[in-house]
Amino acid sequence: MKMVLSQRQREELNQAIADYLGSNGYSSALEAFRKEADISGEAERKIVGLLEKKWTSVIRLQKKVMELEAKLSEAEKEVIEGAPSRAKRSPGEWIPRPPEKFSLSGHRASITRVIFHPTYSLMLSASEDAVIKIWDFETGEYERSLKGHTSSVQDIAFDSQGKLLASCSADLSIKLWDFQQSYDCVKTMLGHDHNVSSVAFVPAGDYVLSASRDQTIKMWEVATGYCVKTYSGHREWIRMVRVHMDGNIFASCSIDHSIRIWSINSRDCKAELRAHDHTVECIAWAPDISTTHINEAAGSDNKKGHHQGPFLASGSRDKTIRVWDVGVGLCLFVLTGHDNWVRELTFHPGGKYLVSASDDKTIRVWDLRNKRFMKTLYAHQHFCTSVDFHKKLPYVISGSVDNTVKVWECR
Protein backbone atom coordinates (compact mmCIF):
# COMPACT_ATOMS: atom_id res chain seq x y z
CA MET A 1 0.00 0.00 0.00
CA LYS A 2 1.37 3.38 -1.02
CA MET A 3 2.18 5.64 1.93
CA VAL A 4 1.01 9.27 1.57
CA LEU A 5 3.20 11.93 3.17
CA SER A 6 1.92 15.31 4.21
CA GLN A 7 3.36 18.42 2.58
CA ARG A 8 5.45 19.13 5.69
CA GLN A 9 6.79 15.55 5.76
CA ARG A 10 7.74 15.74 2.07
CA GLU A 11 9.62 18.98 2.65
CA GLU A 12 11.54 17.53 5.62
CA LEU A 13 12.37 14.36 3.68
CA ASN A 14 13.66 16.38 0.72
CA GLN A 15 15.77 18.55 3.02
CA ALA A 16 17.16 15.44 4.75
CA ILE A 17 18.11 13.91 1.39
CA ALA A 18 19.77 17.17 0.35
CA ASP A 19 21.66 17.31 3.64
CA TYR A 20 22.86 13.72 3.17
CA LEU A 21 24.02 14.38 -0.42
CA GLY A 22 25.84 17.55 0.61
CA SER A 23 27.56 16.09 3.69
CA ASN A 24 28.82 13.10 1.68
CA GLY A 25 30.24 15.08 -1.24
CA TYR A 26 27.66 14.32 -3.92
CA SER A 27 27.71 17.91 -5.19
CA SER A 28 26.40 17.25 -8.72
CA ALA A 29 23.56 15.09 -7.46
CA LEU A 30 22.81 17.68 -4.76
CA GLU A 31 22.57 20.51 -7.29
CA ALA A 32 20.23 18.49 -9.52
CA PHE A 33 18.12 17.35 -6.58
CA ARG A 34 17.77 20.85 -5.08
CA LYS A 35 16.60 22.11 -8.46
CA GLU A 36 14.09 19.26 -8.98
CA ALA A 37 12.78 19.44 -5.40
CA ASP A 38 12.75 23.25 -5.38
CA ILE A 39 14.88 23.51 -2.22
CA SER A 40 16.43 26.82 -1.30
CA GLY A 41 18.50 27.88 1.69
CA GLU A 42 20.27 25.76 4.30
CA ALA A 43 18.70 22.82 6.11
CA GLU A 44 17.20 23.43 9.55
CA ARG A 45 19.31 22.23 12.48
CA LYS A 46 16.89 19.39 13.25
CA ILE A 47 17.31 18.11 9.68
CA VAL A 48 21.11 17.72 9.88
CA GLY A 49 21.99 14.00 9.97
CA LEU A 50 18.30 13.06 10.05
CA LEU A 51 18.45 10.55 7.19
CA GLU A 52 21.23 8.50 8.84
CA LYS A 53 19.38 8.60 12.17
CA LYS A 54 16.17 7.38 10.55
CA TRP A 55 18.04 4.60 8.75
CA THR A 56 19.78 3.31 11.90
CA SER A 57 16.48 3.52 13.79
CA VAL A 58 14.85 1.29 11.17
CA ILE A 59 17.67 -1.25 11.52
CA ARG A 60 17.31 -1.26 15.32
CA LEU A 61 13.55 -1.69 15.02
CA GLN A 62 13.97 -4.56 12.55
CA LYS A 63 16.35 -6.28 14.95
CA LYS A 64 13.92 -5.78 17.84
CA VAL A 65 11.05 -7.16 15.75
CA MET A 66 13.10 -10.27 14.92
CA GLU A 67 13.91 -10.83 18.61
CA LEU A 68 10.25 -10.37 19.59
CA GLU A 69 9.17 -12.77 16.85
CA ALA A 70 11.62 -15.37 18.21
CA LYS A 71 10.20 -14.91 21.72
CA LEU A 72 6.63 -15.14 20.41
CA SER A 73 7.49 -18.31 18.49
CA GLU A 74 8.94 -19.80 21.68
CA ALA A 75 5.82 -18.88 23.66
CA GLU A 76 3.51 -20.31 20.98
CA LYS A 77 5.53 -23.51 20.96
CA GLU A 78 5.07 -23.84 24.72
CA VAL A 79 1.31 -23.31 24.37
CA ILE A 80 1.05 -25.91 21.58
CA GLU A 81 3.19 -28.44 23.45
CA GLY A 82 1.31 -27.72 26.65
CA ALA A 83 4.18 -26.68 28.88
CA PRO A 84 3.20 -28.00 32.30
CA SER A 85 2.55 -25.63 35.14
CA ARG A 86 4.84 -25.54 38.16
CA ALA A 87 2.24 -27.46 40.15
CA LYS A 88 2.44 -30.38 37.72
CA ARG A 89 6.24 -30.62 37.76
CA SER A 90 8.53 -31.66 40.57
CA PRO A 91 11.01 -28.99 41.76
CA GLY A 92 13.79 -31.07 40.24
CA GLU A 93 12.33 -30.41 36.80
CA TRP A 94 11.59 -26.68 37.09
CA ILE A 95 13.44 -24.68 34.44
CA PRO A 96 13.43 -20.94 33.61
CA ARG A 97 10.87 -19.90 31.03
CA PRO A 98 10.17 -16.61 29.21
CA PRO A 99 9.28 -13.90 29.59
CA GLU A 100 11.47 -12.56 32.39
CA LYS A 101 9.72 -11.62 35.63
CA PHE A 102 11.85 -8.47 36.06
CA SER A 103 14.38 -6.56 34.00
CA LEU A 104 16.37 -4.38 36.39
CA SER A 105 18.33 -1.29 35.40
CA GLY A 106 20.59 0.90 37.47
CA HIS A 107 24.16 -0.02 36.63
CA ARG A 108 26.08 2.32 34.34
CA ALA A 109 28.25 -0.38 32.77
CA SER A 110 28.36 -4.10 31.97
CA ILE A 111 27.26 -6.64 34.58
CA THR A 112 30.12 -8.98 35.47
CA ARG A 113 28.47 -11.31 38.00
CA VAL A 114 25.06 -12.04 39.53
CA ILE A 115 24.53 -14.23 42.61
CA PHE A 116 21.75 -15.13 45.04
CA HIS A 117 22.04 -14.68 48.79
CA PRO A 118 21.96 -18.16 50.40
CA THR A 119 19.05 -17.36 52.75
CA TYR A 120 17.50 -13.92 52.16
CA SER A 121 15.29 -13.09 49.17
CA LEU A 122 18.14 -10.98 47.82
CA MET A 123 20.36 -11.09 44.79
CA LEU A 124 23.50 -9.12 44.03
CA SER A 125 24.95 -7.75 40.83
CA ALA A 126 28.55 -6.67 40.27
CA SER A 127 29.49 -4.33 37.46
CA GLU A 128 32.27 -2.66 35.54
CA ASP A 129 30.93 0.60 37.05
CA ALA A 130 32.77 -0.43 40.29
CA VAL A 131 29.48 -0.86 42.20
CA ILE A 132 27.73 -3.87 43.75
CA LYS A 133 23.94 -3.55 43.86
CA ILE A 134 21.52 -5.45 46.08
CA TRP A 135 18.00 -6.28 44.85
CA ASP A 136 14.96 -8.14 46.15
CA PHE A 137 14.39 -10.82 43.50
CA GLU A 138 10.79 -11.48 44.58
CA THR A 139 9.64 -7.87 44.18
CA GLY A 140 12.25 -6.49 41.79
CA GLU A 141 12.98 -3.66 44.24
CA TYR A 142 16.43 -2.06 44.45
CA GLU A 143 17.74 -2.20 48.04
CA ARG A 144 21.16 -0.53 48.22
CA SER A 145 24.62 -0.19 46.65
CA LEU A 146 28.00 -1.21 48.02
CA LYS A 147 30.71 1.22 46.98
CA GLY A 148 34.41 1.00 47.71
CA HIS A 149 36.15 -0.44 44.68
CA THR A 150 37.74 2.03 42.29
CA SER A 151 37.56 -0.11 39.16
CA SER A 152 35.46 -2.91 37.67
CA VAL A 153 34.13 -5.44 40.20
CA GLN A 154 34.98 -8.79 38.63
CA ASP A 155 33.43 -11.36 40.97
CA ILE A 156 31.43 -11.66 44.20
CA ALA A 157 30.79 -14.58 46.55
CA PHE A 158 29.04 -15.27 49.86
CA ASP A 159 30.21 -17.47 52.68
CA SER A 160 27.95 -20.46 53.33
CA GLN A 161 25.73 -18.56 55.81
CA GLY A 162 25.57 -15.32 53.87
CA LYS A 163 27.09 -13.29 56.70
CA LEU A 164 30.10 -12.13 54.70
CA LEU A 165 30.40 -11.07 51.08
CA ALA A 166 33.72 -11.17 49.23
CA SER A 167 34.37 -9.05 46.15
CA CYS A 168 37.37 -8.64 43.87
CA SER A 169 38.26 -6.00 41.36
CA ALA A 170 40.49 -4.73 38.59
CA ASP A 171 41.75 -2.29 41.27
CA LEU A 172 43.88 -5.26 42.53
CA SER A 173 41.95 -5.62 45.78
CA ILE A 174 39.71 -8.16 47.50
CA LYS A 175 37.15 -6.73 49.91
CA LEU A 176 35.06 -8.35 52.65
CA TRP A 177 31.66 -6.82 53.46
CA ASP A 178 29.53 -7.27 56.58
CA PHE A 179 26.19 -8.60 55.35
CA GLN A 180 24.52 -8.95 58.75
CA GLN A 181 24.07 -5.37 59.90
CA SER A 182 26.17 -2.53 58.55
CA TYR A 183 26.88 -3.58 54.93
CA ASP A 184 30.25 -1.90 55.47
CA CYS A 185 33.56 -3.03 54.00
CA VAL A 186 35.31 -4.64 56.97
CA LYS A 187 38.58 -5.69 55.26
CA THR A 188 40.54 -4.85 52.14
CA MET A 189 43.21 -7.33 51.09
CA LEU A 190 46.05 -6.43 48.74
CA GLY A 191 48.77 -8.65 47.32
CA HIS A 192 48.03 -9.43 43.69
CA ASP A 193 50.06 -7.67 41.00
CA HIS A 194 47.26 -7.45 38.43
CA ASN A 195 43.47 -7.56 37.92
CA VAL A 196 41.78 -9.87 40.46
CA SER A 197 39.27 -11.81 38.39
CA SER A 198 37.66 -14.32 40.75
CA VAL A 199 36.94 -14.97 44.41
CA ALA A 200 35.49 -17.90 46.38
CA PHE A 201 35.04 -18.87 50.04
CA VAL A 202 36.25 -22.17 51.44
CA PRO A 203 33.05 -23.87 52.79
CA ALA A 204 34.05 -23.47 56.45
CA GLY A 205 34.14 -19.72 55.87
CA ASP A 206 37.53 -19.10 57.46
CA TYR A 207 39.44 -18.61 54.20
CA VAL A 208 38.90 -16.91 50.84
CA LEU A 209 40.59 -17.79 47.56
CA SER A 210 41.32 -15.20 44.87
CA ALA A 211 42.53 -15.66 41.29
CA SER A 212 44.32 -13.04 39.24
CA ARG A 213 45.69 -11.99 35.90
CA ASP A 214 49.11 -12.21 37.62
CA GLN A 215 48.76 -16.02 37.08
CA THR A 216 48.49 -16.85 40.80
CA ILE A 217 45.81 -17.93 43.25
CA LYS A 218 46.04 -16.67 46.82
CA MET A 219 44.42 -17.89 50.03
CA TRP A 220 43.45 -15.24 52.58
CA GLU A 221 42.58 -15.72 56.24
CA VAL A 222 39.23 -14.04 56.90
CA ALA A 223 39.97 -13.22 60.55
CA THR A 224 43.23 -11.36 59.87
CA GLY A 225 43.11 -10.50 56.16
CA TYR A 226 46.57 -12.03 55.73
CA CYS A 227 47.63 -14.03 52.67
CA VAL A 228 48.59 -17.48 53.95
CA LYS A 229 49.22 -19.38 50.69
CA THR A 230 50.00 -18.70 47.04
CA TYR A 231 49.33 -21.30 44.33
CA SER A 232 51.31 -21.05 41.10
CA GLY A 233 51.17 -23.08 37.89
CA HIS A 234 48.99 -21.39 35.31
CA ARG A 235 50.85 -19.67 32.49
CA GLU A 236 48.21 -17.06 31.69
CA TRP A 237 45.42 -14.99 33.26
CA ILE A 238 43.31 -17.11 35.63
CA ARG A 239 39.66 -16.47 34.82
CA MET A 240 37.84 -18.27 37.64
CA VAL A 241 38.37 -20.23 40.85
CA ARG A 242 35.72 -22.43 42.49
CA VAL A 243 35.97 -24.58 45.64
CA HIS A 244 34.50 -28.08 45.83
CA MET A 245 31.74 -28.60 48.38
CA ASP A 246 33.93 -30.88 50.55
CA GLY A 247 36.44 -28.06 51.06
CA ASN A 248 39.47 -30.22 50.24
CA ILE A 249 40.07 -29.28 46.62
CA PHE A 250 39.39 -26.39 44.28
CA ALA A 251 39.51 -25.82 40.53
CA SER A 252 40.82 -22.93 38.45
CA CYS A 253 40.62 -22.14 34.74
CA SER A 254 42.72 -19.91 32.56
CA ILE A 255 43.46 -18.22 29.27
CA ASP A 256 46.18 -20.92 28.91
CA HIS A 257 43.30 -23.30 27.86
CA SER A 258 43.71 -25.44 30.99
CA ILE A 259 41.80 -26.33 34.13
CA ARG A 260 43.82 -27.16 37.22
CA ILE A 261 42.70 -29.08 40.29
CA TRP A 262 44.45 -28.11 43.53
CA SER A 263 44.70 -29.42 47.07
CA ILE A 264 43.56 -26.75 49.52
CA ASN A 265 46.08 -27.74 52.17
CA SER A 266 49.24 -28.64 50.27
CA ARG A 267 49.49 -26.10 47.42
CA ASP A 268 49.91 -29.11 45.08
CA CYS A 269 48.31 -29.18 41.65
CA LYS A 270 46.64 -32.59 41.64
CA ALA A 271 45.64 -32.57 37.95
CA GLU A 272 45.77 -30.50 34.80
CA LEU A 273 42.79 -30.94 32.46
CA ARG A 274 43.24 -30.04 28.80
CA ALA A 275 40.83 -30.42 25.87
CA HIS A 276 39.45 -26.94 25.18
CA ASP A 277 40.81 -25.12 22.11
CA HIS A 278 40.55 -21.63 23.60
CA THR A 279 40.37 -19.73 26.90
CA VAL A 280 38.42 -21.55 29.61
CA GLU A 281 36.12 -18.84 30.97
CA CYS A 282 34.13 -20.65 33.66
CA ILE A 283 33.85 -23.77 35.80
CA ALA A 284 31.18 -25.24 38.08
CA TRP A 285 31.25 -28.23 40.42
CA ALA A 286 28.41 -30.70 39.94
CA PRO A 287 26.31 -31.51 43.04
CA ASP A 288 26.30 -35.14 44.18
CA ILE A 289 22.73 -35.47 42.92
CA SER A 290 24.03 -35.07 39.34
CA THR A 291 26.15 -38.25 39.53
CA THR A 292 23.51 -40.59 38.08
CA HIS A 293 22.71 -38.27 35.17
CA ILE A 294 26.39 -37.71 34.34
CA ASN A 295 27.16 -41.43 34.47
CA GLU A 296 24.29 -42.21 32.12
CA ALA A 297 25.53 -39.57 29.69
CA ALA A 298 29.11 -40.86 29.90
CA GLY A 299 27.94 -44.45 29.41
CA SER A 300 26.32 -43.57 26.12
CA ASP A 301 29.70 -42.23 24.96
CA ASN A 302 31.29 -45.62 25.70
CA LYS A 303 33.26 -44.41 28.71
CA LYS A 304 33.23 -47.78 30.47
CA GLY A 305 32.72 -48.13 34.19
CA HIS A 306 30.91 -46.18 36.87
CA HIS A 307 32.51 -42.80 37.48
CA GLN A 308 32.84 -41.66 41.07
CA GLY A 309 33.76 -38.05 40.40
CA PRO A 310 33.90 -35.42 41.68
CA PHE A 311 32.53 -33.92 38.47
CA LEU A 312 33.28 -30.50 37.03
CA ALA A 313 31.76 -28.59 34.10
CA SER A 314 33.83 -26.09 32.12
CA GLY A 315 32.82 -23.46 29.56
CA SER A 316 35.13 -21.95 26.99
CA ARG A 317 35.60 -19.36 24.30
CA ASP A 318 35.66 -22.34 21.92
CA LYS A 319 31.83 -22.28 22.42
CA THR A 320 31.72 -25.72 24.07
CA ILE A 321 30.95 -27.05 27.53
CA ARG A 322 32.85 -30.07 28.83
CA VAL A 323 31.99 -32.31 31.75
CA TRP A 324 34.93 -33.93 33.55
CA ASP A 325 35.54 -36.72 36.02
CA VAL A 326 38.17 -34.91 38.07
CA GLY A 327 39.09 -38.09 39.97
CA VAL A 328 40.59 -39.66 36.85
CA GLY A 329 41.21 -36.50 34.80
CA LEU A 330 38.87 -37.58 32.00
CA CYS A 331 36.53 -35.49 29.84
CA LEU A 332 33.32 -37.55 29.82
CA PHE A 333 31.34 -35.64 27.20
CA VAL A 334 31.00 -32.34 25.35
CA LEU A 335 27.92 -30.11 25.02
CA THR A 336 27.73 -28.05 21.82
CA GLY A 337 25.15 -25.52 20.72
CA HIS A 338 26.24 -22.02 21.72
CA ASP A 339 27.28 -19.67 18.92
CA ASN A 340 29.76 -17.66 20.98
CA TRP A 341 31.84 -17.74 24.17
CA VAL A 342 30.41 -19.59 27.16
CA ARG A 343 30.64 -17.16 30.09
CA GLU A 344 29.17 -18.94 33.13
CA LEU A 345 27.72 -22.25 34.24
CA THR A 346 25.45 -23.24 37.12
CA PHE A 347 23.92 -26.61 37.94
CA HIS A 348 20.21 -27.03 38.54
CA PRO A 349 19.70 -27.86 42.25
CA GLY A 350 17.88 -31.02 41.18
CA GLY A 351 21.03 -32.21 39.42
CA LYS A 352 19.33 -33.05 36.13
CA TYR A 353 20.20 -29.89 34.21
CA LEU A 354 23.10 -27.53 33.59
CA VAL A 355 22.42 -23.86 32.80
CA SER A 356 24.84 -21.75 30.74
CA ALA A 357 25.21 -18.07 29.84
CA SER A 358 26.88 -17.05 26.60
CA ASP A 359 28.02 -14.16 24.46
CA ASP A 360 25.42 -15.32 21.92
CA LYS A 361 22.98 -13.45 24.25
CA THR A 362 21.23 -16.65 25.34
CA ILE A 363 20.79 -18.78 28.41
CA ARG A 364 20.60 -22.48 27.62
CA VAL A 365 19.27 -25.29 29.78
CA TRP A 366 21.06 -28.59 29.11
CA ASP A 367 19.65 -32.04 29.80
CA LEU A 368 22.74 -33.80 31.15
CA ARG A 369 21.50 -37.35 30.62
CA ASN A 370 20.73 -36.76 26.94
CA LYS A 371 23.61 -34.32 26.34
CA ARG A 372 21.46 -31.78 24.53
CA PHE A 373 19.99 -28.37 25.22
CA MET A 374 16.29 -28.52 25.93
CA LYS A 375 15.56 -24.82 26.37
CA THR A 376 16.99 -21.60 24.96
CA LEU A 377 16.16 -18.22 26.46
CA TYR A 378 16.90 -15.19 24.29
CA ALA A 379 17.84 -13.39 27.44
CA HIS A 380 19.53 -10.08 26.65
CA GLN A 381 20.24 -7.45 24.01
CA HIS A 382 24.00 -7.98 24.38
CA PHE A 383 26.45 -10.61 25.67
CA CYS A 384 25.06 -12.62 28.57
CA THR A 385 27.87 -12.64 31.12
CA SER A 386 26.52 -14.37 34.22
CA VAL A 387 23.79 -16.70 35.47
CA ASP A 388 22.82 -18.18 38.84
CA PHE A 389 20.17 -20.70 39.93
CA HIS A 390 18.61 -20.38 43.38
CA LYS A 391 19.30 -23.47 45.47
CA LYS A 392 15.79 -23.67 46.99
CA LEU A 393 13.40 -21.37 45.13
CA PRO A 394 12.29 -21.46 41.46
CA TYR A 395 14.33 -18.50 40.23
CA VAL A 396 17.21 -17.90 37.83
CA ILE A 397 19.01 -14.56 37.43
CA SER A 398 21.19 -13.31 34.60
CA GLY A 399 23.42 -10.32 33.86
CA SER A 400 24.63 -8.78 30.64
CA VAL A 401 26.82 -6.29 28.83
CA ASP A 402 23.52 -4.45 28.17
CA ASN A 403 23.78 -3.24 31.83
CA THR A 404 20.62 -5.10 32.91
CA VAL A 405 19.90 -7.84 35.42
CA LYS A 406 16.98 -10.16 34.72
CA VAL A 407 14.95 -12.42 36.99
CA TRP A 408 13.41 -15.55 35.47
CA GLU A 409 10.74 -17.71 37.09
CA CYS A 410 10.96 -21.48 36.76
CA ARG A 411 8.09 -23.85 36.17
From Swiss-Prot:
Q: What does this protein do?
A: Positively regulates the activity of the minus-end directed microtubule motor protein dynein. May enhance dynein-mediated microtubule sliding by targeting dynein to the microtubule plus end. Required for several dynein- and microtubule-dependent processes.
Q: Which domain of life is it from?
A: Eukaryota
Q: Which processes are annotated in GO (biological process)?
A: cell division; establishment of mitotic spindle orientation; microtubule sliding; mRNA splicing, via spliceosome
Keywords attached to this entry: Cell cycle, Cell division, Coiled coil, Cytoplasm, Cytoskeleton, Microtubule, Mitosis, Repeat, Transport, WD repeat
Q: Where is the LisH domain?
A: 9-41
Q: Which residues form a coiled coil?
A: 56-83
- This one is known as Lissencephaly-1 homolog
Q: Which organism is it from?
A: Glossina morsitans morsitans
Classification via InterPro entries: Dynein_regulator_LIS1, G-protein_beta_WD-40_rep, LIS1_N, LisH, PAC1-like_LisH-like_dom, WD40/YVTN_repeat-like_dom_sf, WD40_repeat_CS, WD40_repeat_dom_sf
Similarity comment text for this entry? Belongs to the WD repeat LIS1/nudF family.
User: Subcellular localization, per the record?
Assistant: Cytoplasm, Cytoskeleton; Cytoplasm, Cytoskeleton, Microtubule organizing center, Centrosome
- Gene3D superfamilies of this UniProt entry? 1.20.960.30, YVTN repeat-like/Quinoprotein amine dehydrogenase
